[in-house]
């Protein structure tokens, strides 16, 4: 094992941040700490994850949303202290790792179909029902 990889793993373990599993195509809400003068507040940024880049401590993801008819993209480092929390709202069904083609799309053609796989809650209920039946 590389020394740098080992140091990165230790740092990620030290940060102990719970980051949900999300992929490009998923709609996420990123709560970002914003400092205005002396005050610090949390601002929600909701959009579609169009890319994930890097790995380890340097991993980042790009979120795209439409604000007042204008497309806005923002790149967030996954392990940034400015990120308060990340929540996955819905899972998207896509065939690409980078969804940059959404930049040129408008309206219905920019929609992403929701993935039909069962949610964690549904999986847990099914497992509980299976154990109760036995």
Swiss-Prot record:
UniProt KW keywords: Ribonucleoprotein, Ribosomal protein
Listed Low complexity bias regions: 125-134
GO biological process: translation
Molecular functions per Gene Ontology: structural constituent of ribosome
Function per UniProt: This protein is located at the 30S-50S ribosomal subunit interface and may play a role in the structure and function of the aminoacyl-tRNA binding site.
Tagged with keyword Ribonucleoprotein: yes
Name listed for the protein in its UniProt record: Large ribosomal subunit protein bL19
Biased composition (Basic and acidic residues): 111-123
Coiled-coil residue spans: none
Region described as Disordered: 108-134
NCBIfam families for this protein: rplS_bact
Gene Ontology CC, one term: cytosolic large ribosomal subunit
InterPro entries linked to this entry: Ribosomal_bL19, Ribosomal_bL19_CS, Ribosomal_bL19_sf, Translation_prot_SH3-like_sf
PROSITE patterns, alphabetized: RIBOSOMAL_L19
Pfam families: Ribosomal_L19
Similarity annotation: Belongs to the bacterial ribosomal protein bL19 family.
